[in-house]
Regions:
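Short Lys/Arg-rich basic patches
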Residues: 14-18
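Acidic/histidine-rich alpha-helical segments that form the ligand environment
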Residues: 86-123, 130-144, 148
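Short, contiguous alpha-helical
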Residues: 3-8, 19-23, 30, 40-82, ...
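A short, ordered amphipathic alpha-helix with a cationic face
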Residues: 28-29, 120
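Residues within well-ordered alpha-helical secondary structure of globular protein domains
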Residues: 35, 58-61, 101
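Basic, Lys/Arg-rich DNA-contacting stretches centered on the C-terminal catalytic core
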Residues: 7-11, 85-90
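Surface-exposed helix-capping loop/turn segments at secondary-structure junctions
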Residues: 35-42, 109-119, 154-160
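Long, acidic, intrinsically disordered low-complexity segments
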Residues: 1-6, 93-97
Length: 176
């Protein structure tokens, strides 16, 4: 939640909220991974659908391309098609580590940005966007796939799914 008494600028608050969205996503992803086996991570409901493993690889690939290399104007080595290969058998531990490392790098990039830098233009995937747009795009993209991960987890576990957040727990942060 934003601190309404804070002396943060709008740009600082935007950066904080973008990073918080990723933190909330990771709470939910960790909750799902804690309930799933290695095999369930790579399950998909139909051959043409993505597995949770594919969604993690894809979300991290997008976060790196848009939020790290795109913002920094550094060499992009993303292999987008490889993120969707059904035979990509990366372990749960490796997938979570990939998320952790990618988010840590993204956090460093975002925190280093000045207000003026947020309005600088970049070309990412042949789209002309501001850095602010790139951050908004990639964090909401990550959160969207997080909800797909939750749906795939719930589909597999049914009534045995354990929520990461309960409304009666008295938590101060909004769940995504």
């Amino acid at each position: 939640m934003p601190n309404l008494n804070s002396k943060h600028s709008v740009s600082e608050e935007f950066k904080n909220q973008a990073l918080d969205l990723l933190n909330q996503s990771m709470i939910k992803i960790n909750n799902c991974f804690d309930q799933l086996s290695e095999e369930q991570i790579w399950w998909s409901p139909v051959d043409s659908a993505n597995s949770i493993g594919n969604l993690i690889l894809h979300s991290c690939g997008n976060l790196r391309q848009w939020g790290i290399t795109g913002i920094q104007k550094s060499q992009d080595t993303r292999q987008r098609e490889a993120e969707f290969l059904a035979d990509s058998r990366v372990s749960k531990t490796e997938l979570l580590e990939l998320c952790k490392v990618t988010i840590r790098e993204f956090r460093h990039v975002v925190r280093s940005l000045s207000e003026a830098a947020l309005l600088a233009e970049r070309i990412i995937q042949n789209f002309r966007v501001t850095v602010l747009q790139a951050i908004l795009h990639t964090t909401t993209h990550f959160a969207g796939h997080t909800h797909q991960i939750i749906m795939l987890t719930r589909r597999q576990l049914g009534k045995n799914y354990q929520f990461a957040w309960q409304p009666d727990e008295g938590q101060n942060e909004l769940p995504i």
